[in-house]
């Protein structure tokens, strides 16, 4: 069953032929969203996002502690997996909130560009 689902998703999206866009990723991530109340449960992906973000932080902490801030190939591969999990939870949380990833990404860059133009990238506060 697992192999069939993977084959179905991989067939739908030809990973070797084109770069993946945010909304395409979100659509494919939704196909793997198997949790209680999927489609009307924003709590699960929100908590998952916190957990996976913590795993990224934990790996970074160990790189600082054990490897003198040097990220080798093994650490990079582990971080890539964890960052992928973070991305999955972001995509599914956004979908639960009826938001699309392309719009989120675009609005975020617009916000940051505006802050940069006004010289307020540094500082604190959501509405600077």
Language-model region placement:
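Flexible "arm" and connector segments at domain edges
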Residues: 2-83, 87-128
């Amino acid at each position: 069953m697992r192999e069939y689902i993977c084959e179905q998703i991989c067939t739908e999206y030809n990973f070797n032929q084109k770069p993946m866009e945010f909304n395409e990723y979100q659509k494919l991530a939704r196909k793997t969203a198997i949790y209680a109340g999927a489609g009307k449960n924003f709590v699960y992906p929100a908590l998952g996002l916190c957990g996976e973000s913590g795993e990224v932080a934990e790996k970074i902490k160990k790189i600082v502690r054990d490897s003198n801030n040097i990220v080798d190939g093994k650490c990079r591969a582990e971080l890539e997996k964890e960052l992928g999990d973070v991305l999955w939870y972001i995509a599914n949380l956004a979908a639960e909130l009826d938001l699309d990833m392309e719009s989120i990404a675009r609005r975020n860059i617009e916000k940051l560009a505006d802050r940069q133009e006004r010289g307020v990238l540094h500082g604190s506060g959501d509405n600077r």
